[in-house]
């Protein structure tokens, strides 16, 4: 999976994902599914923001990268991908400037046109289930939620999808491509199935000659940000069960 991630995603996204995992003591050599999940989420956030600007009249416009008018104000402020200290600094600055209510949890983006923070979700499960989980966690009507799935489904607060249809289609196509590329390499099942993920992890540990028990710390210390990403490939109860199964090394 790690090799796939490095081949599939932009080096900048990979670097940001590595820093995020390092910040919370995660080992990307072991938590490879999480590595892929973080990269996917980062890419969707960047694609959400791409090409969207605000003109002098305050209208949202789409500008291609080569357009000379690219000096226009970006419609979205990207918060995801920054270290926590810098991310909160950006959020506080936005709140002070715009008067927006400070969110309890770090959001992914800020929309200067609609004057609201946005939480982006990517899931392979039912979009409405993941949406409800996000809404229950955030508990704020001020933060807009937009969920995408690998099957092309999406769900957003009050059915307000923020972006034009073409921009959202680009994101859906990219997610579908990632799924197809994973499947062609035999990685998709382990990405979405706890059972397959467990098999793959045992195989990886065996090939590295490591004892799974020595990795207990890595499994227990999961950042709040990464917990948000976990439902992309397994629910939290199954995650806990999977981690518990690695607390002991098998007798030789």
Curated annotation (Swiss-Prot):
Q: Which residues does the UniProt site feature Important for efficient shutoff activity point to?
A: 202-203, 206
Q: A GO biological process this protein is involved in?
A: viral translational frameshifting
Q: Which UniProt keywords apply?
A: Decay of host mRNAs by virus, Eukaryotic host gene expression shutoff by virus, Host cytoplasm, Host gene expression shutoff by virus, Host mRNA suppression by virus, Host nucleus, Host-virus interaction
* Highest taxon above the source species: Viruses
Pfam families on file: Flu_PA
Q: What is its main location?
A: host cell
A GO molecular function term, named singly, is: RNA binding
Outline what the protein does: Plays a major role in the shutoff of the host protein expression by cleaving mRNAs probably via an endonuclease activity. This host shutoff allows the virus to escape from the host antiviral response. Hijacks host RNA splicing machinery to selectively target host RNAs containing introns for destruction. This may explain the preferential degradation of RNAs that have undergone co- or post-transcriptional processing.
Q: What is known of its domains?
A: The probable endonuclease active site in the N-terminus and the basic amino acid cluster in the C-terminus are important for the shutoff activity. The C-terminus acts as a nuclear localization signal. The C-terminus is recruited to host protein complexes involved in nuclear Pol II RNA processing.
What is the protein's name according to its record? Protein PA-X
| Annotated organism of origin | Influenza A virus (strain A/New Zealand:South Canterbury/35/2000 H1N1)
